[in-house]
A protein has these predicted regions:
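Conserved beta-strand signature within the Rossmann-like core of class I S-adenosyl-L-methionine
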Residues: 159-166
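Conserved alpha-helix/loop element of class I SAM-dependent methyltransferases that forms part
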Residues: 40-57
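N-terminal, positively charged/glycine-rich alpha-helical extensions of SAM-dependent methyltransferases
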Residues: 1-31
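Short alpha-helix
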Residues: 190-206
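Class I SAM-dependent methyltransferase SAM/SAH-binding core
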Residues: 62-120
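A short acidic, Gly/Pro-enriched loop at the edge of an enzyme's catalytic core
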Residues: 119-130
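Core SAM-dependent methyltransferase catalytic element
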Residues: 206-233
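A short glycine-rich, Lys/Arg-flanked "PGG" loop and its adjoining helix->strand segment in the class I
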Residues: 146-158
Length: 233
């Protein structure tokens, strides 16, 4: 039985104790059934985030943690034949499903997929117009979150946009959120993510917040759109 992590102070974001290898193996294992488990609840939130990002034809866009590729299909359609979409995921199993979905939709040539860790993005500085993350940032350990956002800031061009959809610790949690955190704390291999402060993390990383919305899935969700500042950002 997995050992429980220490009880956090009120308002403290829980740590992630599952290793990257364990996370990769978990998502490889569930890649072919992930949509059955999560798409019904995550899909509407993800689409709200894509609407806020408002990708335009010709843009270069990265999705971190694209999973089975539903957002990649939407992004590929949005950038058109003159744009480019990149997808980076820790799980090769998820990327294989995403590639199959892209081929089925006829957009595989517009999307470049790579297995990797967002702590070290394999893209040139100031090379991307926009970044999208949906239910991904909360998978990183607490000290890693600012590192991931710093990498996002590095690869975005000045004025570039980032939209993040994530399980939120903002505001009153209620029973469901407390139960979510309890499960993560006591069974980290079963529930590998936990609520985080999405907007606050992005502000701390130096992004200019353009909009922030809080919605209810079965847990609270933040949908935040931000921009890398033109000067000094």
């Amino acid at each position: 039985m997995p050992s429980a992590s220490p009880s956090p102070e009120a308002g403290e974001v829980l740590r992630v104790f599952q290793s990257k290898a364990e996370t990769r193996a978990f998502y490889d294992k569930i890649s072919h059934v992930y949509d059955l488990l999560a798409e019904h609840s995550e899909g509407p939130m993800r689409r709200s985030g894509l609407e806020k990002l408002n990708v335009q034809p010709g843009e270069k866009v990265l999705e971190i943690g694209p999973g089975t590729g539903h957002s990649l299909v939407s992004l590929a359609q949005a950038v058109g034949p003159t744009g480019k979409v990149y997808g980076l995921d820790l799980s090769e199993g998820m990327l294989a499903v995403a590639q199959a979905n892209l081929q089925k939709a006829g957009f595989s040539e517009r999307v470049e997929l790579i297995a990797g860790d967002a702590l070290h993005l394999p893209y040139a500085s100031e090379s991307l117009d926009a970044i999208f993350m949906s239910f991904t940032l909360e998978l990183f350990d607490t000290p890693e979150i600012p590192m991931v956002l710093a990498e996002c800031k590095r690869v975005l061009r000045p004025g570039g946009r980032i939209a993040v959809v994530g399980v939120s610790k903002e505001g009153e949690g209620g029973f469901v959120l407390h139960a979510f955190e309890w499960t993560h704390r006591h069974f980290p291999n079963l529930l590998d993510c936990r609520p985080i402060f999405v907007r606050k993390a992005m502000e701390a990383a130096g992004f200019h917040i353009e909009s922030a919305e809080r919605k209810m899935m079965w847990v609270p969700v933040e949908i935040v759109l931000a921009r890398k500042q033109l000067q000094g950002g």
